[in-house]
A protein has these predicted regions:
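Positively charged n-region of N-terminal signal peptides that target proteins for export
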Residues: 1-6
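Bacterial N-terminal signal peptides
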Residues: 7-18
C-alpha cells in the first residue's frame, strides 16, 4: 500500500510536468538523462519512450558506477523540434511484481492494438525469499506490461510479468496480418509470438540464429519494410557497442546479417540502443550517446538523425550529427553549438557550466573568419527585425550572420562589447528572409567571443 500511494503521488506530480517543453537538436532532451529510445507514431504525433538514467540516490545499494533507472517518461512531438515531456508513466514503486529498490527499469517499448496502448518494460522481480543472504544472486530480469487508453498514460501495470520470458530490451512487432511478435535479449536475441491479448506468449520463445556469436548482443528492434523484415541490434564487435542489422522474409527468421548502421561512438559510450521509423517520407534513427555526461557513460542522452535506404533495401550507414533533425524557429534561442558544419580552426564547443552539463553548451570563436553553419532555420513569413546574441568577451568582437553561405546575403552584423558576464547584444536585421534557410555565423574581428545563442526577433 505504501508503494501504491507513492506511485499515485508520482503520477500526480507528473501531471504538472505536461507543459514542460524539451528542446531541439542533439541531444533531443537536455533537462534530464534519457536512453534506449523507442520512437512510435500515434495519433499523428511521434512519441518517444526512453529509459531514464539518474544519479545514484543514497538508498541505492546496487553495483557501483552502474545504470540507475527508476521510472519511465514519454515525450511527444508533432514537428521533430519541440518535445513535450508527459511526465512519469511507470515507476518501479508502482509495479506490484517488481523490486522497488532495484533501479533496473531498462529499455522499453510501446505499441497500439485494438484500442489499447501496451507498454513493455524489463524489471527485476521481488525476491521470493528462498534465495537470500550475502552471496545470493538477484532474480533474473522479467518483462512486464502496462496498459493505457492513450499513448501518454496513465498506464496501469499488470499484476505479474509475462510468463515464460526471462530477459531485457522488449520490442514488439505487429505484422500486417495483426500477429504480434515479442523480441527480447538475454545474451542472445529471442522471439516469441504473442497471444491476441498482447500479455502472454503463444508457444515457446526461440533463439534467432545466424547472428554474431562473439561479443555482447542485445537490444533488438524489428520492423517491416516492403516485404523485408529488419532486425536491428547493438553488438560489441570490439570494445563497445555498434549498431548492426539482419534481414529476413519472415518475422521469426531465419535472418541473415546485413551490415552496420552506426559505428562505435567516438565518445566511447559503451552502449547504444535504437529504433527506426518513417515520418512524412523520411526515415529516422533514434539512438543514444553520452552528450551530457562525457565522463560517465551510464548517464546517457537520446538523439536522432536521418536514415536512408538504398534501392536494394540495404541501410546506409548513419553519421551522427550535432544538428539532428527538424526545423528550428528563427525566433527561438538557436543553439549554434549544435552546428551543421564549422571552420577548420577557431571554433571550440564547451559546457556553459562544467559542474552542471544540463545547462548546455557555448561556442567560442577565437580566430578571425572562424565560422559555424546551422541548417534548417525557419524564418516563416520573414517578419524578424532584430538579431539578438547572448554572448560574452574579454575584448570587443563582431559577428556577422549570412544566409545560406559564407558569402551569401548579410543578415546582420552584431557588435559584442566587452563583458565578463553573459549579456544580450542586438543589431537591426538587414534582410528579412522567408521560409527555411541555413545561417552562417562568422567572427570578423576582435577578441575571442563566447556565444550561448542567437535569435531573430
Amino acid at each position: 500500500m505504501k508503494h501504491s500511494l507513492r506511485y499515485l503521488l508520482i503520477l500526480s506530480v507528473a501531471s504538472f510536468l505536461k507543459t514542460s517543453p524539451a528542446f531541439a537538436t542533439n541531444p533531443l532532451i537536455t533537462d534530464q538523462f534519457t536512453a534506449d529510445p523507442t520512437a512510435r507514431i500515434f495519433d499523428g504525433k511521434i512519441y518517444v519512450y526512453p529509459s531514464h538514467d539518474i544519479k545514484a540516490p543514497p538508498e541505492y545499494k546496487g553495483k557501483p558506477d552502474w545504470f540507475v533507472m527508476e521510472d519511465y517518461h514519454v515525450f511527444s512531438s508533432n514537428n521533430l523540434t519541440d518535445w513535450k515531456d508527459h511526465g512519469i508513466i511507470v515507476s518501479q514503486t508502482g509495479v506490484d511484481w517488481a523490486d522497488p529498490t532495484a533501479y533496473a527499469m531498462w529499455a522499453p517499448d510501446c505499441v497500439f492494438k485494438d484500442g489499447k496502448y501496451y507498454f513493455y518494460f524489463p524489471a527485476i522481480p521481488k525476491s521470493d525469499g528462498e534465495n537470500e543472504g550475502p552471496d545470493a544472486k538477484r532474480p533474473e530480469f522479467r518483462i512486464g506490461v502496462a496498459v493505457s487508453d492513450t499513448p501518454y498514460g496513465p498506464f496501469k501495470p499488470l499484476p505479474t510479468y509475462i510468463q515464460g520470458v526471462t530477459g531485457i530490451d522488449p520490442n514488439v512487432l505487429i505484422d500486417k496480418d495483426g500477429t504480434a511478435y515479442l523480441y527480447y535479449s538475454l545474451g542472445k536475441i529471442f522471439v516469441a509470438k504473442l497471444k491476441p491479448n498482447m500479455t502472454e506468449i503463444d508457444g515457446e520463445p526461440m533463439v534467432i540464429d545466424n547472428l554474431p556469436t562473439k561479443g555482447l548482443l542485445e537490444g533488438p528492434f524489428a520492423f517491416e519494410r516492403k516485404g523485408t523484415y529488419y532486425l536491428t541490434y547493438p553488438h560489441v564487435e570490439n570494445k563497445i557497442e555498434r549498431l548492426e542489422y539482419a534481414t529476413s522474409t519472415s518475422p521469426m527468421g531465419p535472418f541473415k546479417q546485413a551490415g552496420v548502421i552506426l559505428d562505435e561512438s567516438e565518445s566511447g559510450c559503451w552502449t547504444v540502443h535504437q529504433s527506426i521509423l518513417d515520418w512524412q517520407g523520411q526515415s529516422y534513427l533514434f539512438y543514444h550517446d553520452q552528450d551530457l555526461s562525457p565522463a560517465f557513460d551510464k548517464n546517457r542522452s537520446i538523439r536522432a538523425d536521418k536514415l536512408f535506404f538504398n534501392t536494394d533495401g540495404s541501410i546506409q550507414k548513419v553519421k551522427p550529427t550535432l544538428r539532428g533533425i527538424g526545423l528550428v524557429n528563427a525566433k527561438s534561442e538557436i543553439q549554434i553549438d549544435r552546428y551543421s558544419a564549422k571552420s577548420a580552426g577557431g571554433i571550440v564547443v564547451s559546457f556553459n557550466d562544467e559542474a552542471n552539463p544540463l545547462a548546455g553548451w557555448k561556442t567560442t570563436f577565437s580566430a578571425a573568419n572562424s565560422w559555424v553553419r546551422f541548417n534548417d532555420v525557419d524564418f516563416g513569413r520573414g517578419k524578424q527585425k532584430t538579431i539578438k546574441v547572448r554572448a560574452k568577451t574579454g575584448a570587443s568582437s563582431t559577428l556577422e550572420i549570412h544566409l545560406d553561405s559564407e558569402d551569401g546575403p548579410l543578415l546582420g552584423r552584431v557588435k559584442i562589447g566587452e563583458a565578463t558576464d553573459w549579456k544580450i547584444s542586438s543589431a537591426t536585421a538587414k534582410k528579412n528572409p522567408k521560409g527555411v534557410h541555413d545561417i552562417i555565423v562568422t567572427q570578423t574581428d576582435g577578441g575571442a567571443v563566447e556565444v550561448d545563442w542567437l535569435s531573430f526577433r
